[in-house]
């Protein structure tokens, strides 16, 4: 399992200007009888930076079609990539754009306050993106980021959720450039996903369902990378793990898909 720590550098400081913006605060719930606020999950800049530098080059076009508080977008721009982003939360779009303009002024970026599933702005385009990297919402509406019914975070049914993910992946496949295994040219779609446990229904691993969708769309699973997860709610479910005889899930999965001819 790969481990990423928060590095105190300029990129981290830039990301914090967005993640700590009061306009974007959406606490998941409160604990300890309402005295301790538990915030929604926040990405590590070093995690984003590693994937961006490993799978793309300076000047490449990198896209995140569910960018939230913009960690992938900011890391890509910071490392000299052109960036395209989509988010349905207007505050997210404005705050990330402001951070780009203020702290990475020479960056080339197109941020859209629109649906990252359909990506209507590029419906006539194809083979234009060097790297897709996203961190889509968890299944079963685990965390709520806005009230837009088009957002995956508001889709409580699995069939509806994965139906929209399939549409998203179909559009990403059209927009991503073609890879060539023999020539060592890789233009990946990287999707970071997790799992949810639902009592008697057991463990629901998003990677399994998304791999099946990828296979259906003739996308090749090029790699599967596990990284350490440090969930905010971890300490609150330790007793349950012992009582119900399951283990704590402290990892997420990054699925790396590519498109071959």
What is the role of each PLM region?
Residues 1-261:
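Class I S-adenosyl-L-methionine-dependent methyltransferase catalytic core
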């Amino acid at each position: 399992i790969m481990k990423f720590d928060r590095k105190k550098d300029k990129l981290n400081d830039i990301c914090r200007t967005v993640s700590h913006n009061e306009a974007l605060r959406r606490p998941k719930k409160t604990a300890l009888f309402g005295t301790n606020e538990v915030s929604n999950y926040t990405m590590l800049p070093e995690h984003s930076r590693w994937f961006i530098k490993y799978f793309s080059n300076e000047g490449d076009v990198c896209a995140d079609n569910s960018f939230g508080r913009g960690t992938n977008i900011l890391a890509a721009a910071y490392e000299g990539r052109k960036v395209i982003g989509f988010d349905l939360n207007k505050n997210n779009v404005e705050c990330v754009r402001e951070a780009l303009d203020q702290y990475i002024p020479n960056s080339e970026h197109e941020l859209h306050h629109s649906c990252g599933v359909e990506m209507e702005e590029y419906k006539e385009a194809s083979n234009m993106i060097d790297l897709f990297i996203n961190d889509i919402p968890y299944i079963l509406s685990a965390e709520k980021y806005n009230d837009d019914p088009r957002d995956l975070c508001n889709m409580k049914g699995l069939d509806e959720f994965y139906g929209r993910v399939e549409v998203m992946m179909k559009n990403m496949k059209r927009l991503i450039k073609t890879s060539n295994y023999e020539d060592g040219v890789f233009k990946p779609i990287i999707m970071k996903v997790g799992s949810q446990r639902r009592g008697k229904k057991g463990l629901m691993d998003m990677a399994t369902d998304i791999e099946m969708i990828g296979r259906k769309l003739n996308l090749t699973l090029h790699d599967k990378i596990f990284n350490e997860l440090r969930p905010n709610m971890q300490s609150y479910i330790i007793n349950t793990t012992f009582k119900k005889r399951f283990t704590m899930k402290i990892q997420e999965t990054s699925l790396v898909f590519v498109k071959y001819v």
